Structures are given as C-alpha cells and as structure tokens.
Amino acid sequence: MQNKRDSYTREDLLASSQGELWPQGPQLPAPNMLMMDRITKMSETEGDFGKGLILAELDITPDLWFFDCHFPGDPVMPGCLGLDAMWQLVGFFLGWVGGKGKGRALGVGEVKFTGQILPTAKKVTYEIHMKRVVNRKLVMGLADGRVCVDGKEIYVAKDLKVGLFQDTSSF
C-alpha cells in the first residue's frame, strides 16, 4: 500500500485530513479536532493481542483551544477529546491496512477516567492495541486503548469500535 510507513509526522496527519494519504480510505479530522501531533509507531503484528499497535503523541501547550473554554478559570482538556483521539487512531489503522470508506466511531464498551490533562502537562501519549480487524463488505476495527499524560495512565478504553462506510448519507 502506498504511504504505508511505521510512523507519521504532523504534516502526514494533515495530509490525511485532506484525503491525500489514502484517497479511498478514511480521513483524520482537521485541526482543531485532530488530536495528535505525530504517530510514532504502527505495527500489524505487535500489541497486547498481536493484531496491531499504534503509538501517537500530542504536545500540550497552555494555548491549546480547549483550555480557554473548558473550563474558564479551571482549564482541563475534555476527556471526550482523548476518547475521540483513540477512535481517530483506530480509523487511521483501518486506512493503513487498506480499508476503504469513511470512518465513523461505532461505540466503546467501557471507558475509565482516572486523571486529567492540565495546561501544565507536556505530552499526551496514546496507545492502541488492535483486537480485531474485519475487512470484508463491512470494514471494522476493534481495539483497546490507553491515554497517558507525562507517563501516567489516565484513561483506559475497552472495545473501541470504528467502521468504514462507502455511503454515510443514511448513517
């Protein structure tokens, strides 16, 4: 597959948001909703289940858009953005393995938040362990994920589900 590498820069991720990385595959969202600065590792055979591993990072600076509005005087990154980042990465993996279609989050089995991301943090790390990839008429990924801030685990998600669809008009 063209553009299949084991790591991606921010410029690559921005190209994905414009449909330029794999034109028939899923796109990442554009900023401000793009929730990572780089993907540092992609593997089809590693991870907790031997079905794929994705490692990605987001650099934290106090001027990130969400700190101004969530919450004024008590800034914290919304937990849903970390969850969305994990779905973004599962969708990216589906495109990386050749899946075609538009990516949509389909659900999550369980999410636990045990910490927070403050403007004083330096780096968020995302870790996605693929459990299953279905690449037939239905294209779907199932994964577990973790979000860490400055090395400390703060979110855990089980059974993240993302599907790829040729037509989303009736979704």
UniProtKB/Swiss-Prot annotation:
GO terms for biological process: unsaturated fatty acid biosynthetic process. Its EC number is 4.2.1.59, 5.3.3.14. One of its GO terms (molecular function) is trans-2-decenoyl-acyl-carrier-protein isomerase activity. It comes from the Bacteria. Pathway: Lipid metabolism; fatty acid biosynthesis. InterPro entries: FabA, FabA_FabZ, HotDog_dom_sf. It is found in: Cytoplasm. Keywords: Cytoplasm, Fatty acid biosynthesis, Fatty acid metabolism, Isomerase, Lipid biosynthesis, Lipid metabolism, Lyase. Belongs to the thioester dehydratase family. FabA subfamily. PANTHER family: 3-HYDROXYACYL-[ACYL-CARRIER-PROTEIN] DEHYDRATASE, 3-HYDROXYDECANOYL-[ACYL-CARRIER-PROTEIN] DEHYDRATASE. Homodimer. This is 3-hydroxydecanoyl-[acyl-carrier-protein] dehydratase. It comes from Vibrio campbellii (strain ATCC BAA-1116). The gene is fabA.
